[in-house]
Amino acid sequence: MLWKLTDNIKYEDCEDRHDGASNGTARLPQLGTVGQSPYTSAPPLSHTPNADFQPPYFPPPYQPIYPQSQDPYSHVNDPYSLNPLHAQPQPQHPGWPGQRQSQESGLLHTHRGLPHQLSGLDPRRDYRRHEDLLHGPHGLGSGLGDLPIHSLPHAIEDVPHVEDPGINIPDQTVIKKGPVSLSKSNSNAVSAIPINKDNLFGGVVNPNEVFCSVPGRLSLLSSTSKYKVTVAEVQRRLSPPECLNASLLGGVLRRAKSKNGGRSLREKLDKIGLNLPAGRRKAANVTLLTSLVEGEAVHLARDFGYVCETEFPAKAVAEFLNRQHSDPNEQVTRKNMLLATKQICKEFTDLLAQDRSPLGNSRPNPILEPGIQSCLTHFNLISHGFGSPAVCAAVTALQNYLTEALKAMDKMYLSNNPNSHTDNNAKSSDKEEKHRK
């Protein structure tokens, strides 16, 4: 009985194997029922292509790095939205409606909360918030936020502007190129702006801002003085009548010679809005005054005036010249000539005193006519502030000589005519007696 049961099992097993071989498919799942096999069953090797590929599900905090082609919130007035002219073709990607709504609502309310690594992929990265411009890490003063647009100087680079009703940017954040007047109350706040061409405020130039400090050339080593060179002074040195080139300007500013010294100087000037083309030729002849900055030239003129006022031997020169013209017949004529010369010198010094040429940080309003003022300004620009004060000091020394010469002539006349002195005393005594009566 047991032998027949064993034969039936073997016979059924052979039929199963034969059927599997004839049908062309392996009956592997049925073999797994036999406990004698040491191997486990394997899944069927088959691949069914699926046209609708579903991306894996991500939780809501995940932000898709690809831009969405369709925006359900396009009707919202977003100040950071791009103009249609700047839009780029974007690939079509299927999205999840529920997840996109939560993401778009989060982007509208927390636009600044995006991860730092996604900021470079945002096509709107060139548009910045005006709060960041006024209070961001640019070194801007707190008082700059209250400045109106007319209180800011012009910018070097213009921001391209495209009319778009979707862009709503306040006027206070737009900097336009053009001459703008600076008020005294806002000059300190504007001068605190760092000059950097890469930033939005890179073109802001304050003429009174210090460009650099230059050590004096005429001072002793024991008392070296430094003079501040403003942006306005550099602009005057690059403008007519001097028109300095990069080499001469570098020497005036005491910059060390290097291989790329001219290029670095031009780049530094370009940041403050001054253009210095390469290969430029100077317009004026180089003199010793060319090496002086305005501060040192004015200092030299002031010291020269002090020396002329205190040390010039006006009295000794007047007495010496009067002895050479001691003829009594010439004294009256000579005295009239001295008086006329003194009057001419006074008119000349009064004219120079009305000179209002720009110098240093000052640009006073002109008093003289434009024709004569332009000539005086030309002379002042060539001498860098030394010319007019030095001429006034020299003419003042001449006036002191004329005054001493008139005094010496009066003494000489009285010494040569003692009777006239007694007659004058008698006349004065008679007048006093009549006044007493």
Curated annotation (Swiss-Prot):
Signal peptide: none annotated. Residues 14-107, 414-437 are annotated as: Disordered. A motif (PPxY motif) lies at residues 57-62. GO terms for molecular function: DNA-binding transcription activator activity, RNA polymerase II-specific; DNA-binding transcription factor activity, RNA polymerase II-specific; DNA-binding transcription repressor activity, RNA polymerase II-specific; RNA polymerase II cis-regulatory region sequence-specific DNA binding; RNA polymerase II transcription regulatory region sequence-specific DNA binding. InterPro entries: TF_AP2 (IPR004979), TF_AP2_alpha_N (IPR008121), TF_AP2_C (IPR013854). It is found in: Nucleus. Residues 414-427 have a biased composition (Polar residues). The keyword Cell cycle does not apply. Residues 428-437 have a biased composition (Basic and acidic residues). Residues 280-410 are annotated as: H-S-H (helix-span-helix), dimerization. GO terms for biological process: bone morphogenesis; cellular response to iron ion; embryonic cranial skeleton morphogenesis; embryonic forelimb morphogenesis; eyelid development in camera-type eye; inner ear morphogenesis; kidney development; negative regulation of apoptotic process. There is a cross-link at residues 10, 177, 184 (Glycyl lysine isopeptide (Lys-Gly) (interchain with G-Cter in SUMO2)). Residues 65-74, 88-101 have a biased composition (Low complexity). Binds DNA as a dimer. Can form homodimers or heterodimers with other AP-2 family members. Interacts with WWOX. Interacts with CITED4. Interacts with UBE2I. Interacts with RALBP1 in a complex also containing EPN1 and NUMB during interphase and mitosis. Interacts with KCTD1; this interaction represses transcription activation. Interacts (via C-terminus) with CITED2 (via C-terminus); the interaction stimulates TFAP2A-transcriptional activation. Interacts (via N-terminus) with EP300 (via N-terminus); the interaction requires CITED2. The PPxY motif mediates interaction with WWOX. Belongs to the AP-2 family. This is Transcription factor AP-2-alpha. It comes from Bos taurus. The gene is TFAP2A.
